[in-house]
Amino acid sequence: MGSLEKFNLIDEPWIPVLKGGRVVEVGIGEALLRAHEFARIETPSPLEEAVLHRLLLAVLHRALSGPRCPEDVLDWWRKGGFPQDPIRDYLNRFRDRFFLFHPEAPFLQVADLPEENPLPWSKLLPELASGNNPTLFDHTTEENLPKATYAQAARALLVHQAFAPGGLLRRYGVGSAKDAPVARPALFLPTGQNLLETLLLNLVPYTPEDDAPIWEVPPLRLGDLEGARTKWPLTGRTRVYTWPARGVRLLDEGDGVRFMGYGPGVEPLEATHRDPMVAQRLDAKGNLLVLRLSEERSFWRDFSAMLPRQGGKVAATLEHAENLQGELEDEGLEGRITLRVLGQVSDQAKVLDIRREVYPLPSGLLTPKAEENLEKALKMAEELGQGLKHLAQEVAKAVVGERDRGHGRSPYLEELTKLANSLPLERLYWHALDGAFPRFFARVEEEASLDLWREALRGAALEAWKATRRFLGTGARHLKALAQGEQEFGRLLGELGEEVRT
């Protein structure tokens, strides 16, 4: 190994895992060969959690040339581990391509990107400040930028290549860059009781032909990327899992990284490939669109949009996990599974939020009965939510009083809107349901689940209305508004006893 070859991701500790209640860091080899010993990948960052799993899955797919069928996955589950020799052989064969620093082929980077006009490493993570971008959660600036450890830099590199939103670039003949492969979609990651189970739950059957991860193709050079010269079809599972969305060259300072060379990456050509972790919904025009996270609402409210009843397409990882769970139950094997929905909310090039939502994954979620119950439950919740929103507007109108509204957006309308939005009615209702939904979802296939959900809706609405009454006050106009609102609120609760309109 030459002096310029440094920090091999196969052996060096950089992937945080939970073992025996403690977080330790391991390399790719240990993570895969001892996956059964680790509870899970443990990181506060939902984006890191997603990309670390995608990297490990890419290595497994290529090392095992599969799985070719679900039976392969079930066999590895029964045996309690992956075949070790193929994994060791594969990692040894491509060992030189996993150095974070390398004169010719640094991992997921471009070796000849110039050092001039470097950017801070923090640009790799949406939650850290960089240049003129506003901070999301952190107040780091280029003046007080701490060094990233090699492990931090490696994880940040993976996050950026998968999640970088498109936007202005103006480097090396490229004015703007396109979205990284999963910059917009919600990602579905079923998880088991240890890292081995989690990887198996996401190891969707795979055909290795016409696919290659970044370490199996010749290293990219600046000349390949200038002027958006290199374009690849967005196809091939491991190609997409390890996509070089941007040209990056981490600049080693001997004990960490503060700056990097930065430029354009490989431009994606649209293709029919579906990322296994991504679901799709049908829009009003009959087009399939990727399912995204929303800044205003929790993901569960959009769950049914991906189900076949509504013309959507479930993420392949979710379908695979459901099928595997059924097989395990048939054999009397335990398989408690949860579902993690990961991703970011962005507006063009600006990242607004980073999310991880965790739900139980019920057996039989994709059965007709479960789909029907879920669709009805979400429709009930939305109808009551809309009713409460209208109620808040009516209460606000009664408090403000009727006035001449004039033309355009009058002060009256602004006052009315401000008061209605300040009432906690709708906000507290949805907040309560965020906590209630997982309990319903765990039993979604059961006949009684809708009755339980109605009670949850009723309880959430009642508590939200009580809080609204306390919030509004006891002035004469306020009491009159609440008295009028009480009748409307009673009508809304009465409708809960009726069957959902279909």
Curated annotation (Swiss-Prot):
Signal peptide as annotated in the record: none
Keywords: Antiviral defense, Plasmid
Gene Ontology process terms (BP): defense response to virus
InterPro entries given in the database record: CRISPR-assoc_prot_Cse1 (IPR013381)
Keyword Cell inner membrane: no
Presence of keyword rRNA-binding: no
Pfam families: CRISPR_Cse1
Family: Belongs to the CRISPR associated protein CasA/Cse1 family. Type I-E/Ecoli subfamily.
Function: CRISPR (clustered regularly interspaced short palindromic repeat), is an adaptive immune system that provides protection against mobile genetic elements (viruses, transposable elements and conjugative plasmids). CRISPR clusters contain sequences complementary to antecedent mobile elements and target invading nucleic acids. CRISPR clusters are transcribed and processed into CRISPR RNA (crRNA).
Oligomer status and interactors: Monomer. Part of the Cascade ribonucleoprotein complex. Interacts directly with the 5' end of crRNA, CasB, CasD and CasE. Binding of target ssRNA or dsDNA causes a conformational change in the Cascade complex; CasA is required for high affinity target DNA binding. Interacts with Cas3 once Cascade has recognized target DNA.
UniProt protein name: CRISPR-associated protein CasA/Cse1
